């Protein structure tokens, strides 16, 4: 069973979608499209479509939505009004139903996308209650409590309803397969990778140029479109709809389908829909205990599989690593410092009136490695945070070549070529190594020499972490299982794979062994030799002595001394402030 699932997982998404449609059609053929079993199979498909949509919003984007039932109801009513009242063709009624969900999802996502998990849950729950009430109140359109009947499938405007019993079942089977394919494509796309990155580590994602807000709005819109399409299919399946079919419980049911199946996984929503439609129907034969057994079953399943039945969320990122594995070894040029790349001009940054940076100025040149050192709390990390846009400066400016970075968002600064690592690696647990590198891949056409050097550096960093870039299985595994050292190398490899102009490294040696530090130093030196300006914040003074061209010593938010590392130990003020020697 496990081997079969493994093989099915490895099929391309398009084939998986086709297979799903074929299986649904075969089962429908065996049971008869008008039979009770046929109805149940179609209901599973319809709910699966809505659950796949919710998996985009909640699973991929991590936005807890309790409002999937509202989009489902909206799609059902838009489709039912167009099909029943205006006698539109079924394909167009379904399409417009889905579009209504897309628009409603985007309209919800724009204000809701900036809220935290609880705020989002509250807004979406409010939406379900509002929509449910509107279905009753706007009876001129919705039929109020009586609902809408006569929802017949037509091929063209005002034509007679189609005779065939197969139109609706076939449409349901095809749309389910199509939605599964679209859902998988979404996860595999750059947008999907960005969405998961924001879910797992929003600050790390912003450092790669990803806008968290837009990924959430897109996920809301896509998730609602799926739900509305499911709702439209439900209207045709039932031929009659009323508000009773869309109680707030429906949204909870969709959520449980996603969580039970495995939030964020690609097969989970299908499994969730299958189980949560079939199990209650089987239990209906035992009316006194059915709810108790159903509840206990859910508890036991979640206890045994806390991340759901299908927990794997990482997806292959085709060709992401080919350029790394196939890259020929490149000779490393001698390192020379060139023109200024990054300049801090009198940067101040205060927190509640206390200045963490109080007028810091320094310059980093092309190909140069600058060590930013100083005692704990002297402002080193704050300086990196100001450069990469996480903290806007209180006053002063940071200039990247000719661009003033002050006031730009972290995403905008990252897109201009500033990459960084963090004291604690901000990698994305639900994404594979391949996906990390694919997400960070440069958007434009970088200088070929820089590109070759960066690819070589990425390969060597992965190897330093004991990861073989040619080992496809390892490269497609979720990074959540990786050790601290491996994550450090992965984070650095990710930052470098974007071919940055400036590389900021925050305590890269922390937690690494002596040999790992040495290997890391060689990679950083080679990247600098290819023209990248590097700033290293580090307490490991031996590493600083070996690696950097120039040291900038911070103390209490000001530059205490600047010069070559060899002279560091001879400067009294540095010894006093930094090493505690008075
Ligand atoms: N978000 C924040 N809110 C309030 N104070 C902050 C914030 N970030 C930094 N600080 C303060 O700014 C000062 C400088 O902190 P910073 O982390 O930049 O020092 P550091 O030199 O990197 O220290 P370490 O070597 O321990 O990492 C500290 O006093 C710190 O408490």
For each of these PLM feature ranges, what is it?
Residues 503-507:
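Catalytic Walker B motif of ABC-type/P-loop ATPase nucleotide-binding domains
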Residues 2-329:
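Transmembrane alpha-helices and adjacent helix-loop boundaries
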Residues 388:
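Helix-to-loop junction immediately C-terminal to a conserved catalytic motif
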Residues 544-546:
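A short, surface-exposed alpha-helical micro-motif characterized by mixed small hydrophobic
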Residues 370-375:
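The feature captures the beta-strand-to-loop junction immediately N-terminal to the Walker
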